[in-house]
């Protein structure tokens, strides 16, 4: 029902039955359906007439059959009484005085009620001795009437009633009828009072303690609250609180600390308001430096060295156009050798790119689109730095990335410039006037005047080779060379590679060189490895040296030929 005060169909059926002096009777005829959705059939008997109806509940079925009976019943219906109308009754049970107060607040005019004395009656005394019809001994008192004067702004209204409250309601009702249709007057604040009114409105919502702290903060004055006295029985305590604000102080008393603190703040607040107002200080305006907008260049030379995908996107943003649209067209090739084809679309322009993965294909497609739009190709930033020589980020050693492999043949040992210079100096100092030649087995046991002649010990040549490789000079070779007395024609400088080849040939270092390479590949120390090999197989080296010397015995003119070959090589 929309209105709870409206009568239901069953209530109206009961009124109809009372009016016709019959008894309504409801009967539950049937109940069917599952437990969660049952249907009930109800029968209503009113006099000689019966009606049936169904509903999801017994109550709903009764209401439905009652509605059916009201529409189809032939019994005479009672006349509906009109609702009582009372002028003083307002909708929503709001009294006229309350409604008038709200209207008066909107208008900014207070409503003031003043009671008035009733008019005095004439001084008339009846004849109490005559007991006639019109002169009874005991007279009924005249009913008293109350009068009220209501003032709303410049308007005055009078009300009367049996009680003082009824008189007030009567006056408020007359004021409402007169003021409801009048426009609300506009109140313009007077000069000099508007600011005070605004401040008063703001301060009205703040407590006295908050106002004290605000004033003290503006004037840089310290604030302190202290309970100085506490007296009275436990159920009726009395507290005295002292507040100090700079040079001002006040005390407040109350039955709680909060109340005493509030009263003390109220007292000191009155003294603080007497202080002269603070001078108005204009704050300097803050000037914020505007940041320049990020300039996105869209020239043909912009972005060289950037990623083509980012470069193409920035160019489109600078043009305020739609960003590039990338689509994967196809994927072809063997499982381990895939090839992706990516398409990029910028406006009406379309370009494609291929690559072993989607990222490279997308990059190539963006590069092709840049070339198609008339921009220069993107070059690597590292290549640009190498060309221009600009590497301002780091001047120290480069990070330990793997160095690119060179095309040097295997088995060739590179000597540093320092080692090479020492070897050249020692060679000029010691070898000048000596001859180079291959040693025969006959000369193994004889001291030779040549530079690489071997001492009677079997491992002297190995010692010379090791010293030359490690230090660049050989003290053993110098000692042997000093013993030689036969002068020989000077030989032109020999290349270090030839020297190393000669040492390896006479010592049989082919296996040792490969072992050094294996040691370097395994991360071991090649010198220690070579020394271990030499210490473990000295006898084998001596035997191998004799065989090499027999096979490679050179004629006397071989030294000159070697010198010529070395000169031509240099």
From Swiss-Prot:
Any GO molecular function: Hsp70 protein binding
Annotated region (Disordered), positions in chain: 71-94, 181-203, 387-409, 528-570
Subcellular location(s) per record: Cytoplasm; Nucleus; Nucleus, Nucleolus; Endoplasmic reticulum
A single GO BP: cellular response to oxidative stress
Protein known as: Double-stranded RNA-binding protein Staufen homolog 2
Domain notes: The DRBM 3 domain appears to be the major RNA-binding determinant. This domain also mediates interaction with XPO5 and is required for XPO1/CRM1-independent nuclear export.
Residue positions of motif Nuclear localization signal 2: 373-412
Region Required for dendritic transport, annotated ranges: 381-570
Keyword Phosphoprotein belongs to the record: yes
Phosphothreonine found at: 405
Native species: Homo sapiens
Modified residues (Phosphoserine): 188, 395, 416, 426, 440, 455, 492
Disulfide bridge partners, by residue number: none
Quaternary assembly: Interacts with the exportin XPO5. This requires RNA and RAN bound to GTP. Interacts with microtubules. Isoform 2 and isoform 3 may also interact with ribosomes, and this association is independent of translation. Identified in a mRNP complex, at least composed of DHX9, DDX3X, ELAVL1, HNRNPU, IGF2BP1, ILF3, PABPC1, PCBP2, PTBP2, STAU1, STAU2, SYNCRIP and YBX1. Interacts with TRIM71 (via NHL repeats) in an RNA-dependent manner.
Annotated DRBM domain residues: 8-75, 95-181, 207-274, 307-375
Gene3D superfamilies, A to Z: 3.30.160.20
SMART domains in alphabetical order: DSRM
């Amino acid at each position: 029902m929309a209105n709870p005060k409206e009568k239901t169909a069953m209530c109206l059926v009961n009124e109809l039955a009372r009016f016709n002096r019959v008894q309504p009777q409801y009967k539950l005829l049937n109940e069917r359906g599952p437990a969660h959705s049952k249907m009930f059939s109800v029968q209503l008997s009113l006099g000689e007439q019966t009606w049936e109806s169904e509903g999801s509940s017994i109550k709903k079925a009764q209401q439905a059959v009652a509605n059916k009976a009201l529409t189809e019943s032939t019994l005479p219906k009672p006349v509906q009484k009109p609702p009582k109308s009372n002028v003083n009754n307002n909708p929503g049970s709001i009294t006229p005085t309350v409604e008038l107060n709200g209207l008066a607040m909107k208008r900014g005019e207070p409503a003031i009620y003043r009671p008035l004395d009733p008019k005095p009656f004439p001084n008339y005394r009846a004849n109490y001795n005559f007991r006639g019809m019109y002169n009874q001994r005991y007279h009924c008192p005249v009913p008293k009437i109350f009068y009220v004067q209501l003032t709303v702004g410049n308007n005055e209204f009078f009300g009367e009633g049996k009680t003082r409250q009824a008189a007030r309601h009567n006056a408020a009702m007359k004021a409402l009828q007169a003021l409801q249709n009048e426009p609300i007057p506009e109140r313009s604040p007077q000069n000099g009072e508007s600011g005070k009114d605004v401040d008063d409105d703001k301060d009205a919502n703040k407590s006295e303690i908050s106002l004290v702290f605000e004033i003290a903060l503006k004037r840089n004055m310290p604030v302190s609250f202290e309970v100085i006295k506490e007296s009275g029985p436990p159920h009726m305590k009395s507290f005295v609180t002292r507040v100090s604000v700079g040079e001002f102080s006040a005390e407040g008393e109350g039955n709680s600390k909060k109340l005493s603190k509030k009263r003390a703040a109220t007292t000191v607040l009155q003294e603080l308001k007497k202080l002269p107002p603070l001078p108005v200080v204009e704050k300097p305006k803050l000037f914020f430096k505007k940041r320049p907008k990020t300039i996105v260049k869209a020239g043909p030379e912009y972005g060289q060295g950037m990623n083509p995908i980012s470069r193409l996107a920035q160019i489109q943003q600078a043009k305020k156009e739609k960003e590039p649209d990338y689509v994967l067209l196809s994927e072809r090739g063997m499982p381990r050798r895939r090839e992706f084809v990516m398409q990029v679309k910028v406006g009406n322009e379309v370009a494609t790119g291929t690559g072993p993965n989607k990222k490279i294909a997308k990059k190539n497609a963006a590069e092709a689109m840049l070339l198609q739009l008339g921009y220069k190709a993107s070059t690597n930033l590292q290549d640009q730095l190498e060309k221009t020589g600009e590497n301002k980020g780091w001047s120290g050693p480069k990070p330990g990335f793997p160095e690119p492999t060179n095309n040097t043949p295997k088995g060739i040992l590179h000597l540093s410039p320092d080692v090479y210079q020492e070897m050249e100096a020692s060679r000029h100092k010691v070898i000048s006037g000596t001859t180079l030649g291959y040693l025969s087995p006959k000369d193994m046991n004889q001291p030779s005047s040549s530079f690489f002649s071997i001492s009677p010990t079997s491992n002297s040549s190995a010692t010379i080779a090791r010293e030359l490789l490690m230090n660049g000079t050989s003290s053993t070779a110098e000692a042997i060379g000093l013993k030689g007395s036969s002068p020989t024609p000077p030989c032109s400088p020999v290349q270090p590679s030839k020297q190393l080849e000669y040492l390896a040939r006479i010592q049989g270092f082919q296996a040792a060189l490969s072992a050094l390479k294996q040691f370097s590949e395994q991360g071991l120390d090649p010198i220690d490895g070579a020394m271990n090999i030499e210490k473990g197989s000295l006898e084998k080296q001596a035997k191998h040296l004799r065989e090499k010397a027999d096979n490679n015995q050179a004629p006397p003119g071989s030294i000159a030929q070697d010198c010529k070959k070395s000169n031509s090589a240099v």
